[in-house]
Structure formats: structure tokens, C-alpha cells
């Protein structure tokens, strides 16, 4: 079902009929930083997301990258795959101790890591200068999460790029 607007009665009816409906809300764009270029990556049939990600991270300019995933399990899986490909990465999420998260964040800030993988919970607490790219490995569940993720790049008047993977 596609509609430009839905009133509450329509939303109630939809929730009665559809199983696990997905709501896509498009905003005016005024909510995100104007210094951030936002791009979608449409995965074609047969493309493996982690392989596309690894290829992206080999490109020039992908120096300080934050990757966001929906769950702690996904964050750990992505980190494991990137490390197997000799990409300097680490992860932060709720199952890691505060000490571990701080060490990983400090290593990322110091340039010892190319990539930091995090859950949305971490998105609000990450304050790092010069993040070149943000990659949404999975589409965030809310507009608020998207805004906070994308807001990790393009700070202090600098430009940044945010990518979001889209699967068919």
C-alpha cells in the first residue's frame, strides 16, 4: 500500500489487515545536515552485501568510517568479516564494557582504526572529528535513528558522505 498521507483510521485498518507492514516516511530533508551527501546503494540480485562493503572500504578516501547495524549480533558479524579481510576495525555496542567501548573509540579517533561498527545506541554518543563516511548496513527503523547516524559525518562545516544499503 502506498499513500502520501494516512489518517489514524486508515493506519488502524492497515494494522488489522497487513502482517508486519513497513512504514517509509519521507521528510523534507531539512532534518539532516546540509554538509552530508546522502546516497543509496541498491544491491542487485546475487550481490553479497559484505563483499560490496569490503570493496567500498578499499576505495581512496574511506579513511574514517562508521558503519551502523541494527543488532549487536550484526555488528559483531560485520567486524569479524572486515578483520578477516585485514581491514582495521572494531565494534561498540551494549554487550561491550564501557572500558572496551572507550578504548575502541579512542583508537578510532587516533586513526589506528579505519572502521568503527556500532548499534544505534552508540550513534548518539559518538563524537569524532573528520568522519569521512557513515554506512547504514541496514536501514534504520526510525527517522530519528537515521538522522543521528548520518549526523556523525559532515560536522564542523566539513563535508561527509552517508550511504544506505537497499536490498530488493
Predicted segments, located by residue:
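Conserved helicase RecA-like core
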Residues: 1-168
Amino acid at each position: 500500500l502506498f499513500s502520501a498521507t494516512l489518517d489514524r483510521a486508515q493506519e488502524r485498518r492497515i494494522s488489522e489487515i497487513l502482517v508486519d507492514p513497513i512504514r517509509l516516511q519521507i521528510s523534507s530533508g531539512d532534518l539532516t545536515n546540509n554538509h552530508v551527501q546522502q546516497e543509496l546503494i541498491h544491491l542487485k540480485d546475487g550481490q553479497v552485501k559484505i563483499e560490496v562493503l569490503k570493496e567500498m572500504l578499499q576505495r581512496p578516501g574511506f579513511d574514517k568510517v562508521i558503519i551502523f547495524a541494527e543488532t549487536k549480533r550484526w555488528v559483531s558479524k560485520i567486524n569479524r568479516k572486515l578483520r578477516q579481510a585485514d581491514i582495521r576495525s572494531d565494534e561498540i555496542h551494549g554487550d561491550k564494557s564501557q572500558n572496551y567501548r572507550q578504548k575502541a573509540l579512542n583508537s578510532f579517533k587516533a586513526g589506528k582504526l579505519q572502521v568503527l561498527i556500532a548499534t544505534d545506541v552508540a550513534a548518539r554518543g559518538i563524537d569524532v572529528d573528520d568522519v569521512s563516511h557513515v554506512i547504514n548496513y541496514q536501514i534504520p527503523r526510525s527517522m530519528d535513528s537515521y538522522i543521528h547516524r548520518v549526523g556523525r559525518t559532515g560536522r564542523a562545516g566539513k563535508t561527509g558522505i552517508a550511504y544506505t544499503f537497499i536490498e530488493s
